[in-house]
Design a protein with these regions (language model features):
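Loop/helix patches that line or flank the sugar-binding groove of alpha-linked glycan CAZymes
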Residues: 72, 78-79, 83-307, 313-317
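Short, surface-exposed beta-strand/loop "edge" segments at domain boundaries and coil↔beta transitions
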Residues: 49-51, 303-306, 337
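Acidic/polar loop patches that form or flank catalytic/metal-binding clefts of enzymes
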Residues: 12-21, 190-194, 276-283, 330-334
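Active-site-proximal helices and loops of the catalytic beta/alpha 8
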Residues: 1-82, 93-108, 199-231
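C-terminal beta-sandwich/jelly-roll accessory domains of carbohydrate-active enzymes
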Residues: 313-337
């Protein structure tokens, strides 16, 4: 902790900028936010929003969002990310160490943190790997090697990625966009990888067998991609990594199509920037009646009003009345349309 604060202070004195990506308890992330790195990687809600995608239930996600508030962490100080070069970690350190005995309410039961952790992990492993999704692989004992697109495929119950139809790809894209919206329509930094932009699928394990001899299954999620169609017919990168199947195509192709994944992202990010959502202040997370619903409310900068992010984690339409306390009446604007 002290080392983090010293390094952060030295970087600030040099006019630099820093962030830390240690997978820590919420207690430690809160402590580091006071005098340490400017930003912390959001290991708090990252496993939780994937859990919501896979189960269609936002209860654990709401629990973790409220935990952020409980510990006085400003969501604007977090880097909310989609896929990166590492596995989707399911370590859930917060419930493993300091809060193994702390009671939590989940699905109507009171569970110690250690039991809640194992329940979440078992659900994630079952839904995101093994028989249900054989294209994703466990990484050692605390995570799963996967891509954002393969998370979406698993959530949709698609077992064989070699026989995807155009309709399947469109459904994967919609789930992928849901994940982007959760991360982008809240305060803080949103991080999207090149693998996300092209809709990369995991490589077959045999394609990177030599790189996985030490058990590092993460190589299946690190397939090569070509954002600008520089070498569209090249099957292997200059470093010898096989090209991943890109469900959405290159950026060059996508930006010519207003309905493509990248074009939809471009629109989302323009809305995020226009309204100053990154610098907004998140209000308490409301209760909901429908398990698949998540509501986040944000006070926009410069008194521009209250922004509401309403996300449905299942494909079925829903209707619910939410009472917004302490929100002044005013005109309602659909920011995306």
């Amino acid at each position: 902790m002290v080392g983090n604060q010293i390094i952060g202070g030295m970087i600030r004195k040099a006019g630099g900028f820093s962030f830390q990506e240690l997978n820590l308890t919420v207690d430690d992330i809160a402590s580091m936010s006071k005098g340490g790195a400017y930003l912390s990687y959001d290991f708090i809600t990252r496993p939780a929003y994937h859990h919501a995608v896979l189960t269609g239930n936002t209860e654990f996600l709401r629990l973790m969002l409220r935990t952020v508030h409980e510990y006085g962490i400003d969501p604007a100080s977090l880097i909310h990310a989609l896929q990166n070069h590492d596995e989707l970690t399911l370590e859930l350190v917060h419930f493993w160490t300091l809060h193994a005995s702390t009671p939590y309410t989940f699905h109507g039961q009171t569970l110690p943190g250690a039991v809640l952790r194992e329940h979440i992990r078992e659900t994630m492993y079952e839904n995101l790997s093994g028989e249900h999704a054989p294209y994703n692989l466990r990484f050692v004992t605390n995570g799963i090697a996967c891509t954002s697109a393969s998370v979406a495929a698993a959530a949709l119950g698609l077992r064989d990625l070699t026989v995807l139809t155009d309709a399947d790809i469109e459904r994967i894209k919609r789930v992928h966009l849901l994940m982007v919206m959760f991360n982008a329509f809240q305060p803080g930094v949103v991080a999207v990888s090149g693998w996300d932009l092209v809709g990369a699928l995991p490589l077959p394990a045999e394609a990177v067998a030599e790189r996985m001899v030490d058990g590092d299954t993460r190589w299946i999620q690190r397939g090569a991609y070509d954002l600008a169609d520089v070498a569209p017919d090249t099957p292997v990168s200059a470093e010898g990594v096989p090209r991943a199947v890109a469900l959405y195509g290159s950026l060059t192709q996508q930006l010519a199509d207003p309905a493509s994944f990248a074009s939809r992202l471009k629109h989302m990010f323009s809305v995020r920037q226009a309204y100053g959502i990154a610098a907004s202040r998140q209000l308490p997370i409301p209760d909901v009646l429908t398990p698949s619903l998540l509501i986040m409310m944000h006070e926009l900068p410069a008194g521009r009003g209250i922004q509401i992010t309403a996300l449905n984690f299942v494909p079925d339409p829903l209707e619910e009345i939410i009472v917004l306390e302490h929100v002044p009446p005013g005109p309602v604007v659909d920011m995306l349309n």
